[in-house]
Amino acid sequence: MPNTAMKKKVLLMGKSGSGKTSMRSIIFANYIARDTRRLGATIDVEHSHVRFLGNLVLNLWDCGGQDTFMENYFTSQRDNIFRNVEVLIYVFDVESRELEKDMHYYQSCLEAILQNSPDAKIFCLVHKMDLVQEDQRDLIFKEREEDLRRLSRPLECACFRTSIWDETLYKAWSSIVYQLIPNVQQLEMNLRNFAQIIEADEVLLFERATFLVISHYQCKEQRDVHRFEKISNIIKQFKLSCSKLAASFQSMEVRNSNFAAFIDIFTSNTYVMVVMSDPSIPSAATLINIRNARKHFEKLERVDGPKHSLLMR
């Protein structure tokens, strides 16, 4: 019997012009940053269903941020908007001149969430950080984060700095979708087993359409803590370039005297990246190991997937 889809309601909210639709279009609709300039303002609520990892469907509510719409969300549409929410993503324009009003609307959202979906996870994105002078970004973000955490009580919120012009958008959205994957701990355990079996330094699992990182394993600390989202951004751009040439991205191998890295189609919904610090291991051996693990990870993607882990045969 085929698995039924598991729908997760995600609210995307924030003042008009804060950049909600632009980031949604980049992550889920394959826009590049410069093309988002032609997007118009969202009218009321735009619904979209994004299939993610096969059975998981993100029911994304992109809520227009004009004052009239915002007031309606908290009055006549309150129950409809805020009922059965899994995740609230609130986007703040870091250069907004109406910060007090932004915070007021955010707190109104939290009150409605507490009443209708008290278990929802809250994410705050301090957006358009590219407009802030580089030497001021850490300080400004830290101040905003402290304010948002204080205003969010008794709820917890996770804060991210974001920009459509760099990899920070992928870091934030990878963290968000990670919270929505039902069997993520089982996935991570099997990814760790897989990495240890093939003697890999790192293994990353990317969602196939968005190239968001959904799981990873590393056996030792690496110098660049932002490398995952950088890879997401680079490969997503490369995939889009391939599409413009009527070609599809299949796989990639990068190798030098210190390491070998492989990116390959893994399951019907994922790509895998394997990093080996022993470049003497033949490429063919690693690619065979990836191929042999595919069937097992295909089963894991189902909500009712197997409870056993990947072990050496």
Swiss-Prot record:
Cross-referenced InterPro entries? Gtr1_RagA, P-loop_NTPase, RagA/B
The protein's UniProt keywords, in alphabetical order, are: Apoptosis, Cytoplasm, GTP-binding, Host-virus interaction, Hydrolase, Isopeptide bond, Lysosome, Membrane, Nucleotide-binding, Nucleus, Phosphoprotein, Ubl conjugation
CDD domains (alphabetical): RagA_like
GTP-binding among keywords: yes
Q: What is the effect of changing residue 100 to A?
A: Abolished interaction with TFE3 and TFEB without affecting interaction with RPTOR
Post-translationally, this protein is described as follows, namely: Polybiquitinated via 'Lys-63'-linked polyubiquitination by RNF152 in response to amino acid starvation: polyubiquitination of the GDP-bound inactive form by RNF152 promotes RRAGA inactivation and interaction with the GATOR1 complex. This does not affect RRAGA degradation.
Q: How is its activity regulated?
A: The activation of GTP-binding proteins is generally mediated by a guanine exchange factor (GEF), while inactivation through hydrolysis of bound GTP is catalyzed by a GTPase activating protein (GAP). The Ragulator complex functions as a GEF and promotes the active GTP-bound form. The GATOR1 complex functions as a GAP and stimulates RRAGA GTPase activity to turn it into its inactive GDP-bound form, preventing mTORC1 recruitment and activation.
Q: According to the UniProt record, what happens if one changes residue 154 to A?
A: Abolished interaction with TFE3 and TFEB without affecting interaction with RPTOR
Q: In which tissues is it expressed?
A: Ubiquitously expressed with highest levels of expression in skeletal muscle, heart, and brain.
What family does this chain come from, according to its entry? Belongs to the GTR/RAG GTP-binding protein family.
- Name the record gives this protein: Ras-related GTP-binding protein A
What lineage is this protein's organism placed in? Eukaryota, Metazoa, Chordata, Craniata, Vertebrata
Source gene?
RRAGA
